[in-house]
């Protein structure tokens, strides 16, 4: 029987570093639930010591997730480990992942230390983490540029200290697959207690070979792969988990290992991450790109029609991509919409049926026919905007032309009060944004604007994603409508609600901190 490769997802920790705007706790939980449904073994969900907000989101996910092991990152620093344990302790079981650099360059220039001191610190911190949990992972940062003999010393000491998983990262995406496999093989040859730990790998894509490096390491004996959905991450990104997972499945004949992933959830999880993180998937992206199963060559098309295996090494259905598109109309009842959502793999918790059906009827009245991609877009927006709103778009009107200055009139519900303003702008969208900013008084700077069609044809839904800068922080907003000006207005209102909610969360965190301080003084 083949051995299992543990899938360790770091989309919510390392992957998030690539985003232009930080995710809210609710958005992180949405992604965590999708990852749990896909069956990841371990999910690294944050760096709790970095901020009160990250602490809260790690705690929320740890409290909610039951079928995947929740993990948090900590440097080899006492406070990091203690805070990580505090955030994770609400989980039934959890992992602490601690790390320190081991390469000569990092030790000399970053840590200004010695290898012996690094080993001593690693041992102490692994033991400290073991006081909180028996599931401790230790990473040798920049292992790819660490001499194997040095690496073996660190690994042996960390295992003796109690680390159950040893992670070997190619932190800067520098090594070649044959080199990386050699590092893993070298550790198996040099570390006498290596059988007491699982060897993990964490690769980056700076040279475009993160997946190749991970697979080479698995072939050499690594039994955990770390990565992120869609390969998101800082610089050129992380190892794309969906690619590793499907490579292991498709080429089990030579790799002879398996994962416990539910492959039929890959496509949906990939889409969830892409939409929430506002990171579109390239059409030519392996496994999950829109062109991954497209055949434009006449020869290829003929071959696929005769036998799909002529040019397809896996099927769209194997990753959960249902290519059958059905349409509904305004005469379709609630039960029909719910049934179609179930057929597409959605659970009741993925959307609010009442809100979704209302949005469906409005769209059906406009378009006549509503397709699967419309429903999925509506369900996504429905989930993003289900929280209480302080701002709500009540009305807007725009006048613009090729030689006229665009003018917009906007009515906005601000709490219980309706406010109205008009403004000019450089085009209809800018005019609306100027009017909204006048109403709210929020000082926001638009730094990114994306428009994507959700479907086909002139009546397709248009999704607008924006990122704004507000007092040094970046916030993401999304809007959906068949009218792109309306989508743009909704996106700005969504972003303002996110800013408002962030301020409310900050007030609540300050209140909790003050209460904690008052309790200390009382004692």
UniProtKB/Swiss-Prot annotation:
InterPro entries: 2-IPM_HCS-like, 2-isopropylmalate_synth_dimer, AIPM/Hcit_synth_CS, Aldolase_TIM, LeuA/HCS_post-cat, LeuA_allosteric_dom_sf, LeuA_bact_synth, PYR_CT. It is found in: Cytoplasm. GO terms for molecular function: 2-isopropylmalate synthase activity; acetyl-CoA C-acetyltransferase activity; manganese ion binding. Pathway: Amino-acid biosynthesis; L-leucine biosynthesis; L-leucine from 3-methyl-2-oxobutanoate: step 1/4. Gene3D superfamilies: 1.10.238.260, 3.30.160.270, Aldolase class I (3.20.20.70). Residues 5-267 form the Pyruvate carboxyltransferase domain. It comes from the Bacteria. Coiled coil: none annotated. Homodimer. HAMAP family: LeuA_type1. This is 2-isopropylmalate synthase. The lineage of its organism: Bacteria, Pseudomonadati, Pseudomonadota, Gammaproteobacteria, Enterobacterales.
């Amino acid at each position: 029987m083949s051995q299992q490769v543990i899938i360790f997802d770091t989309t919510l920790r390392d992957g998030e570093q690539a985003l232009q705007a930080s995710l809210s706790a609710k958005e992180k939980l949405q992604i965590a639930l999708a990852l749990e449904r896909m069956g990841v073994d371990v999910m690294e969900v944050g760096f709790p010591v970095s901020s009160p907000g990250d602490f809260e989101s790690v705690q929320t996910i740890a409290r909610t997730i039951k079928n995947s092991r929740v993990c948090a990152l900590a440097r080899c620093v006492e406070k990091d480990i203690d805070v990580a344990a505090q955030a994770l302790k609400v989980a039934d079981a959890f992992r602490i992942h601690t790390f320190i650099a081991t390469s000569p360059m990092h030790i000399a220039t970053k840590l200004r230390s010695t290898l012996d001191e690094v080993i001593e610190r690693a041992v102490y911190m692994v033991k400290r983490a073991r006081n909180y949990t028996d599931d401790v992972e230790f990473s040798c940062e920049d292992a790819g540029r660490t001499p194997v003999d040095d690496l073996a010393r660190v690994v042996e000491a960390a295992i003796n200290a109690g680390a159950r998983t040893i992670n070997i990262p190619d932190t800067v995406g520098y090594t070649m697959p044959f080199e990386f496999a050699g590092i893993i093989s070298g550790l198996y040859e040099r570390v006498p207690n290596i059988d007491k730990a699982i060897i993990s790998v964490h690769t980056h894509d700076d040279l475009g070979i993160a997946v190749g490096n991970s697979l080479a390491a698995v072939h050499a004996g690594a039994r955990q792969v770390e990565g992120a959905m869609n390969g998101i991450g800082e610089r050129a990104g992380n190892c794309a988990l969906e690619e590793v997972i499907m490579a292991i499945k498709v080429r089990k004949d030579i790799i002879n290992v398996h994962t416990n992933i539910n492959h039929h959830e890959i496509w949906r999880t990939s889409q969830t991450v892409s939409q929430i993180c506002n990171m579109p998937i390239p059409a030519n992206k392996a496994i999950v790109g829109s062109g991954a199963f497209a055949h434009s060559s006449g020869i290829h098309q003929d071959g696929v029609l005769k036998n799909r295996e002529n040019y397809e090494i896996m099927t769209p259905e194997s990753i959960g991509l249902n290519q059958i598109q059905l349409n509904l109309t305004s005469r379709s009842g609630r039960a029909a919409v719910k049934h179609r959502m179930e057929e597409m793999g959605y659970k009741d918790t993925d959307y609010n049926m009442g809100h979704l059906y209302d949005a469906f009827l409005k769209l059906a009245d406009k378009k006549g026919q509503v397709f699967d991609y419309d429903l999925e877009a509506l369900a996504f927006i429905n989930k993003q905007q289900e929280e209480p709103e302080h701002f709500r778009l009540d009305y807007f009107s725009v006048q613009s032309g090729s030689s006229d200055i665009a003018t917009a009139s906007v009515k906005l519900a601000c709490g219980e009060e309706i406010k109205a303003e008009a403004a000019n702008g450089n085009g209809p969208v800018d005019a609306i944004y100027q009017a909204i900013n006048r109403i709210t008084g929020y000082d926001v700077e638009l730094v990114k604007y994306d428009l994507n069609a959700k479907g086909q044809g002139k009546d397709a839904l248009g999704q607008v994603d924006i990122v704004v800068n507000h007092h040094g922080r970046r916030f993401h907003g999304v809007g959906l409508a068949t009218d792109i000006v309306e989508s743009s207005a909704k996106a700005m209102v969504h972003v303002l609600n996110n800013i408002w909610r962030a301020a409310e969360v900050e007030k609540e965190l300050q209140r909790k901190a003050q209460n904690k301080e008052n309790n200390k003084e009382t004692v």
